[in-house]
Amino acid sequence: MSTRIALLALALFAAVAQAQKSPLPVYKVDPFWPKMPLPNKWIIQGVPTMVTDKDDHIWVLNRPRDINPDENGAATKPPRTDCCIAAPAVLEFDTAGNLLKSWGGPGYTDGWPAQGIARPGAAAEHNIMVDREGNVWISGSSQGDSIQKFTADGKLLWDFGHRAARPPAARLPENNQQTEVFPGGIFFFDLDEDAREIYIVDAKRVLVYDYDGKFKRGWGGHGIPLSEIDNNPTPPYDTSGNPPDQIQFAPALHCVHFSVDGLVYVCERGSNRVQVFTKQGKFVSSFFVHPSTPSRGPECGGPGSQLYGMCGTIYNLTFSHDADEKYVFLADGTNDKIWIHDRKTGALAGSIGDNGRMAGQFHWIDAIAIDSRGNLYTGEVDTGKRVQKFILTNGDGKLRPRPHE
């Protein structure tokens, strides 16, 4: 009996120790981050992505073209009102909320996203990454866009190319077998710096290029080869029963990230699903995020989406800052939440926030990032137009930079 009791006590101790090792993160919003007002009467617009660098600086990709006429009165000559002017496209903040650098925007370079396109929203700046050397990489999601690499101060270093013709040229039809151009621009990419590779999600596939822009490999949903990906429109998403059992990716693929154990996580927004692969494209696992949410709506990102968002649940993700990255945080711009899932099992563990305009709430959350102390940063598009900071309240105080940064 005493042996059984001892074994039971040991098992309970191990369970408690494991729970204490990676407790569910608890956050509180910092309503005073970033520090306001910004200089020059600047105002932040839609924020599709943000990233933290090796110094825990937060790089925000802002969409100046999203500004409304009643917001930019100070930009006219003479000024109509005291405020405001759209902030530049690239904003660097420290963890205290101080603005450190700012640059970029429409016309900044010949290859800047959505060059010559005036309309706001989807046809604009879309992704930002910062490498270990401090270089800033930016892509856009309009016809003819690509990736450009800059110094931290905004000097153009390199252009990825692989551009389709810009409007008014007709947009090329979907072709998941060709790897030369990106007809709809480049929504999202990530950098494997050790291998010097660029991972791009596009249409129904993941494509990998080297740092010279040469294609290396690619795959579709569940790791199928590019040759087996269909080029047909994706069927409607059915929320009446279980999640759809679909092998192919369902656009939009809205992010790609690497975990600490070298796996590739793909945000399949069209199926409310995360698919996980090895870096060679072998399928590992998948899990759904609030699968009853409508997705694949034709008006996603368009005029009707203000009335009924049909974009799905997975806009972006980041991983918890514990050594094993036990949790994955998923930004859901349709339900306006951050879902917390167990990274390895895919099980739902909790959530942060809800719909609203107050601090700690969201309207169309699109961007999410984490620093080495486990604090979260978020950005919102549509009329949300802001960034927020959420402070980890139950961390161990250890600094853990992202392994690939």
Predicted ranges, named:
Residues 1-5:
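Positively charged n-region of N-terminal signal peptides that target proteins for export
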Residues 6-15:
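Bacterial N-terminal signal peptides
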Residues 19-405:
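Eukaryotic scaffold repeat domains enriched in small/polar residues
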